[in-house]
A protein has these predicted regions:
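Exposed beta-sheet edge/beta-hairpin loop segments within beta-rich domains
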Residues: 61, 97-103, 118-120, 141-151
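Beta-strand elements of well-folded, non-transmembrane domains
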Residues: 72-76, 114-118, 133-136, 159-163
Length: 199
């Protein structure tokens, strides 16, 4: 049976610089985005059965879309520039303000580590979505009451598939399983161009 997922850590995003069919994409400098709370991946499959002799004789059920809902503990100003393409605009009320503008949201690679458990033994799966762009479609702000309400951002990402091996088949994500969290993080750092000085 599949190992149950018992944790998540180390969310990383790197801007997509270029991609040529048949090769892995090239990424700019990646960063670790705060701490991870959860990520939900949803997939859409094509359902197009071929009927013959009053029955299904074949079916085209390839994946047509992949979406990610990601919840970090928060976003820094630099995270928002990287993820959403926000810009700095000078002399706004006498200061340089960060502005949400009608900019194109950039594509990038997004990765994280899934902690797995199998009868007391832990493993660490590093997952990378190769090409995805995120939006923050809502923002909740609330007054403080008797107990603090932790209003954290929810990012919605739509992925695009890439030909990374010349086969003509499109890939959405890659992953590898490691016996330690540090090894999984090191692989993400390598793949998504994260400097160890920033982690």
């Amino acid at each position: 049976m599949p190992n149950p997922n018992v944790g998540m850590m180390y969310p990383v995003f790197a801007p997509l610089v270029s991609h040529t069919d048949g090769s892995m994409p090239t990424y700019g400098a990646g960063v670790v985005i705060q701490e991870a709370r959860n990520a939900t991946v949803s997939k859409t499959y094509n359902e197009n059965p071929l009927y013959g002799d009053d029955r299904i004789v074949d079916d085209d059920n390839g994946m047509t879309a992949l979406n990610i809902s990601f919840e970090p503990t928060g976003l820094s100003d630099s995270d928002r520039v990287l993820l959403f393409g926000e810009t700095l605009k000078g002399n706004v009320g006498g200061i340089t303000a960060q502005v949400e503008m009608d900019n194109e949201t950039p594509y990038g690679g997004f990765g994280y580590v899934r902690k797995m458990r199998d009868h007391g033994t832990y493993s660490y799966e590093a997952w990378i979505t190769l090409k995805v762009k995120f939006t923050e479609e809502s923002q909740t702000t609330a007054t403080k009451e008797q107990n603090i309400s932790w209003n954290v951002p929810t990012l919605n990402g739509r992925a695009a598939a890439l030909d990374i091996d010349g086969s003509g088949k499109l890939s959405w994500r890659i992953h590898y399983s490691f016996t330690s969290a540090s090894a999984a993080k090191t692989w993400l750092n390598t793949m998504l161009n994260v400097s160890t000085a920033t982690t």
